[in-house]
């Protein structure tokens, strides 16, 4: 299974009381299809996976696959800090028809490199579902080394990685050393253009939640080696990329979507609304690219 381009790390819409808003979820999927987004990544970090129950997590995957209806590929967030839970989620994603699973480095329990390797190998061996690794040490604390990634790249069923460290030098080394066919994706909007120009297949993007067409165009230009166009689009999105991380993701991007009228403004504790001091900053960034 090959993926490329702009893959949106989709938010999970909620009502102000924290209940899941499946109507808005389906509407967002339709919008991304219309705007040219190349793939959906659901119930990951941006989708607030730690804040939903296992049953809700499974239903969000099922609804996304059902509503996408083959119009756009769906990568299901199947990560957990329990290997058994990760296997359970991956089996469900496979059963309902997701094209792949995104599996994050186990968080909080801080496994060493051998533990990380065995965790992902166990998931891949248990479920016949293409797996995209996800390294985001700023959220997980444990950091999967390039050496561990390269070991895992040899495991059947592990097809790629979302490289969300934001370290271009590290990503460049991984691109140079990874086996042919191993798919590297940026997971960091501010540095995505650079990594794609170096050979990454695309970007698993937070910014694409609010600027899907622009992010699709950026990824297309970078993949095609059009440096002037890539620089132009990257400069246009730079302020927005920064603003959407002014507080912990997905606080700013959910606030932005509510301002744009796509969703209600809802979170689940411990996530709360964007601090008022940042409202004008995010609003200005949206206005600058014509989204408000």
Curated annotation (Swiss-Prot):
SUPFAM superfamilies: Aldolase. One of its GO terms (molecular function) is 4-hydroxy-tetrahydrodipicolinate synthase activity. Keywords: Amino-acid biosynthesis, Cytoplasm, Diaminopimelate biosynthesis, Lyase, Lysine biosynthesis, Schiff base. Pyruvate binds at residues 46, 204. It is an enzyme of class 4 (lyase). Its EC number is 4.3.3.7. It catalyses: L-aspartate 4-semialdehyde + pyruvate = (2S,4S)-4-hydroxy-2,3,4,5-tetrahydrodipicolinate + H2O + H(+). Disulfide bonds: none annotated. The record marks 45, 108 as: Part of a proton relay during catalysis. Its main location: cytoplasm. Pathway: Amino-acid biosynthesis; L-lysine biosynthesis via DAP pathway; (S)-tetrahydrodipicolinate from L-aspartate: step 3/4. GO terms for biological process: diaminopimelate biosynthetic process; lysine biosynthetic process via diaminopimelate. InterPro entries: Aldolase_TIM (IPR013785), DapA (IPR005263), DapA-like (IPR002220), Schiff_base-form_aldolases_AS (IPR020625), Schiff_base-form_aldolases_CS (IPR020624). One of its GO terms (cellular component) is cytosol. It holds the Pfam family DHDPS. It is found in: Cytoplasm. The keyword Cytoplasm applies. The active site is at 134 (proton donor/acceptor), 162 (schiff-base intermediate with substrate). Homotetramer; dimer of dimers. Belongs to the DapA family. Catalyzes the condensation of (S)-aspartate-beta-semialdehyde [(S)-ASA] and pyruvate to 4-hydroxy-tetrahydrodipicolinate (HTPA). This is 4-hydroxy-tetrahydrodipicolinate synthase. The gene is dapA.
